[in-house]
């Protein structure tokens, strides 16, 4: 599922994509997929990209700072930036992009020749991801937070669990 979140400076319990018209919105610049899926969501909602003042060249950290400074109205952002903005009162969750449903975020590309030459390697890769996902769906957010906590030394387990839970 899409891990990006749209946060705004004001509470917006009845968010609709059309409400972004006329707003200055910072989008994720570090990787292309969140911007592509947001464009698709907007198109499906009948919203023209030209009606929104986009900030496309800043990092998520820079967009978080810009939201805090009142320089932009909304951000498309990942954790832990989203949680930090919500916890300090600057950001309000407008939309969790995960509601769009399953999407292909972990993808592996190879040639037909490699697949034919190394079928067991390909199968092992897919089976490994399947096993990892099964564990993630079985464990509680706190268990998952504890398992991956060493990768996020600046976050305590409770905060990380809150982010994992969404």
Segments predicted by a language model, with ranges:
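Short, glycine-/small- and polar/acidic-enriched structural segments
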Residues: 1-66, 73-79, 92-96, 102
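A bilobed periplasmic-binding-protein/Venus flytrap-type ligand-binding module shared by bacterial periplasmic
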Residues: 3-14, 105-121
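Solvent-exposed, polar/charged alpha-helical surfaces in well-ordered, non-transmembrane soluble domains
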Residues: 18, 36-40, 65, 69, ...
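Short polybasic/polar patches that bind polyanions
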Residues: 43, 86, 150
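N-terminal secretory/targeting leader peptides
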Residues: 89-92, 153
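Active-site-proximal catalytic alpha-helix in oxidoreductases
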Residues: 103-110, 126-130
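Secondary-structure end/capping motifs
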Residues: 116-166
């Amino acid at each position: 599922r899409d891990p990006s979140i749209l946060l705004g400076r004001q509470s917006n319990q009845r968010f609709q994509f059309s409400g972004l018209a006329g707003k200055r919105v910072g989008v994720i610049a570090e990787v292309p997929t969140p911007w592509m899926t947001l464009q698709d969501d907007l198109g499906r909602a009948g919203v023209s990209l030209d009606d929104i003042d986009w900030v496309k060249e800043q990092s998520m950290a820079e967009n978080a700072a810009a939201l805090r400074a009142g320089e932009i109205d909304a951000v498309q952002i990942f954790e832990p930036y989203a949680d930090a903005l919500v916890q300090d009162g600057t950001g309000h969750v407008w939309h969790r992009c995960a509601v769009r449903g399953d999407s292909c975020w972990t993808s592996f590309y190879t040639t037909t020749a490699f697949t034919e030459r190394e079928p067991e390697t390909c199968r092992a890769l897919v089976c490994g991801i399947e096993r990892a996902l099964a564990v993630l769906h079985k464990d509680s957010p706190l268990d998952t937070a504890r398992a991956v906590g060493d990768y996020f030394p600046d976050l305590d387990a409770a905060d990380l669990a809150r982010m994992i839970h969404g």
